[in-house]
């Protein structure tokens, strides 16, 4: 039975569970926290009121910021929808990209859906295999792996012809 009382200070659901851990998981709903508990991940918390596109009101983060000072890794496991992605970007901005990691749930909406479809071991692996926030303006091998493979197999693509045989054959 989850309730929000009018005028009450908003805090993360299950916030005390991250005390003493160097990492934590932030979800978008209480049921996602319970799904992670089922998968053996106890240091999971949830934003108190989900994510909305119209509001970036993260007062609850300001109220709880001290809980994150000692965290070396913060895994963001938000919903795979537009409001969830907006929440993710705002959390990255406020908490710092250097400590944030991203968990994805393939075609599933969230951690709870993933648990129902694939089971608790698969959900735990999704969290364990979370990836760092991609750096802006940095290209990694994974980003261009397909292009490199094509080049190795096929070489340079033929350039434009200008109509002068000595140049066209280069």
Per-region residue spans from a language model:
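Phosphate-handling DNA/RNA-contact segment within nucleic-acid enzymes
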Residues: 1-70, 88
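Short, small/acidic-rich helices and loops at N termini and domain boundaries
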Residues: 17-26, 86-146
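Short beta->alpha junction loops/turns
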Residues: 29, 80-81
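Residues at the starts of beta-strands that form the adenosine-phosphate
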Residues: 43, 73, 99
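The Walker A/P-loop phosphate-binding site
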Residues: 136-170
């Amino acid at each position: 039975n989850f309730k929000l009382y009018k005028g009450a200070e908003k805090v993360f659901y299950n916030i005390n569970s991250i005390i003493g851990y160097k990492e934590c998981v932030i979800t978008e709903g209480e049921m996602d926290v319970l799904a992670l508990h089922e998968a053996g991940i106890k240091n999971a918390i949830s934003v108190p009121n989900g994510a909305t596109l119209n509001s970036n009101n993260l007062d609850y983060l300001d109220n709880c910021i001290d809980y994150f000072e000692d965290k070396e890794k913060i895994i963001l496991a938000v919903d795979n929808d537009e409001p969830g992605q907006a929440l993710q970007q705002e959390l990255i901005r406020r908490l710092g990209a250097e400590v944030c990691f991203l968990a994805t749930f393939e075609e599933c909406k969230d951690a709870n859906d993933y648990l129902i479809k694939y089971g608790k071991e698969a959900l735990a692996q999704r969290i364990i295999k979370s990836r760092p926030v991609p750096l802006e303006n940095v290209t990694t091998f994974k980003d261009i792996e397909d292009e490199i493979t094509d080049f190795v197999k096929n070489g340079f693509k033929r350039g434009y012809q200008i109509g002068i045989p000595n140049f066209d054959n280069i």
